[in-house]
Amino acid sequence: MKYLQTVASMKSKFDIVAIVEQYIKLVKSGSAYKGLCPFHAEKTPSFFVNPLQGYFYCFGCKKGGDVIGFLMDMEKINYNDALKILCEKSGIHYDDLKISRGSENKNENKDMVSKIYSLNSRLINTIKFFLSKNKKALDYVLKSRAISKEIVDLFELGYLPFNFKNGLELHDFLVSKGYSSEVLRKSGLFSKTNPKVSILFQRLIFPIKDFKGNVVGFGGRDLDGKGSKYINLGETEVFKKRELLYGFYEGFEEIKSTKSVILVEGYIDVLAFFTSGIKRAVSTLGTAFSKEHLALIQRYADEIIFSFDGDDAGLSATLKAYQICLPFNINVSVVRMDFGTDPADVLKSEGVDSLQKILNNRCDAFEYLLDVYSNKYNLNKTVDLNAMINLFLNLINLSKVDTQKKIFLDKLSNKLGIGVTTLLKDYYRIKERFVVDNNKRNLYAHNDDSYERYLIVALLKNFSYFSIVRRNIIDSDLINVDARKVFMCFENLFENNKDFSLMDLKKNLKDTYKVSEFFLKKF
């Protein structure tokens, strides 16, 4: 009881507004304060802080709580760590607080997180050493991709040989240093089917950091052409792909000062921009750009510049990412890349100033897509013309700003030579259909013949397509719960480069992922 009273007293005398304002801008609104929610992307403030009652609440994402809960969510820390921060600011000695038994599970989780951080930190210096001794890996980064040594050091790139140290493999070496089998299993470094084999062996390694600089995971690139080109660790206690962007920590100061982020396709592209002196490039971790990524960016920037590869996959990624951004009225532009090239190619062939030049010539995302798709479609064919009209009217419908919609309609009208009045008729038809589709969304989730089941069947027939699909879809995009679980299983198989039979897969889906028998019978 004394512990609870102490915590309550501490919270009551601490200004929650002062804490929240360290993360977002607040403005007075009656007796409360409001601002843009830091936990989801939005363009109109729905996040409120009540200083009298000491709580926050967002009417958009429904997240709320007290000052400790806010710190836990913002810093991705547990209850006790948030409490420590408040103790420091309140002049209370944390050690004097008697933590109740109810916090034991939290402490266990904190202990595991601490051990994973320790393990990852220990690994950093070792993989950096092995990279310095591996000519092939060094030549790939420094010569083939023209990344500067300064940037290699900044991002702490590494390499992991098969024979780790003194004839020991990595697993046995770490055990000899006191790490338990449970910690090694939960670190994500090792194969689930062969727990002593690291999924990163003989790969160029990219340490991935959270916004506080903790190494939370790793990505790896194959240099021999023997496995998946890129892999990332699976999800762990500290490694949440939807909450992370590669390069965000290293580029944080420039992102804050310019209020701008360059979104690229992969790790090497991030390094290419940094080598050019442009230190605000980020990439997702092998998954599609999501609303969670956008929410992270919008805390610190009001502009996103897409710089994806100049191929069909890059165009598809640009379109999907733009569809996510449009409802939130963030300024989006696109860097034009020649077909088949990426930022690292431009850096190597044209020098360190080349990326700044193409960045200066970026164009509005809507205009870029309009130009590209008008060349991609044969507008003399009715079917192609209708497809383009539908594509762009659906895009326009995503915008929440009426003036922006009018500008987009004018641009589409000028490009196609079709009057705005005519386009508006189709637009309102699409808008009505969109409302109907939304109302039926839950019904479709239980429709056995939904497109999601067909997607799963197609991937089962040719799993190699998954490397393309995963760049444009993440599991949360799927409506059907069972389809989502299957997709998560596929992600795990892909990350571990594992072969499988249909019989083994079905057993795994049933026993591990709890996919329903009814769904499994469909394939």
UniProtKB/Swiss-Prot annotation:
Name the reaction it catalyses: ssDNA + n NTP = ssDNA/pppN(pN)n-1 hybrid + (n-1) diphosphate
Ligand binding (Mg(2+) 2): D309, D311
List residues of the Toprim domain: 259-340
Q: Does the keyword Protein biosynthesis apply?
A: no
Q: How is the cofactor bound?
A: Binds 1 zinc ion per monomer. Binds two Mg(2+) per subunit.
Q: Which InterPro entries match?
A: DNA_primase_core_N_sf (IPR037068), DNA_primase_DnaG (IPR006295), DNA_primase_Znf_CHC2 (IPR036977), DnaG_bac (IPR030846), DNAG_N (IPR013264), DnaG_primase (IPR050219), TOPRIM_DnaG_bac (IPR034151), TOPRIM_dom (IPR006171)
Q: Name one Pfam family in it.
A: Zn_ribbon_DnaG
Give the E.C. number(s).
Answer: 2.7.7.101
SMART domains under this entry? TOPRIM, ZnF_CHCC
- Which residues hold Mg(2+) 1? E265, D309
- What SUPFAM superfamilies does the database record attribute to this sequence? DNA primase core, Zinc beta-ribbon
For the protein in the UniProt heading, the enzyme class is transferase
**What are the recorded Gene Ontology BP terms?**
DNA replication, synthesis of primer
The stretches annotated as zinc fingers (CHC2-type) lie at 37-61
**Which cofactors does this gene product need?**
Zn(2+); Mg(2+)
Keywords (alphabetical) are: DNA replication, DNA-binding, DNA-directed RNA polymerase, Magnesium, Metal-binding, Nucleotidyltransferase, Primosome, Transcription, Transferase, Zinc, Zinc-finger
Q: Heme: present as a keyword of the record?
A: no
Q: What is known of its domains?
A: Contains an N-terminal zinc-binding domain, a central core domain that contains the primase activity, and a C-terminal DnaB-binding domain.
What does the subunit section of this Swiss-Prot or TrEMBL entry state? Monomer. Interacts with DnaB.
* Function text: RNA polymerase that catalyzes the synthesis of short RNA molecules used as primers for DNA polymerase during DNA replication.
- What protein name is recorded for this chain? DNA primase
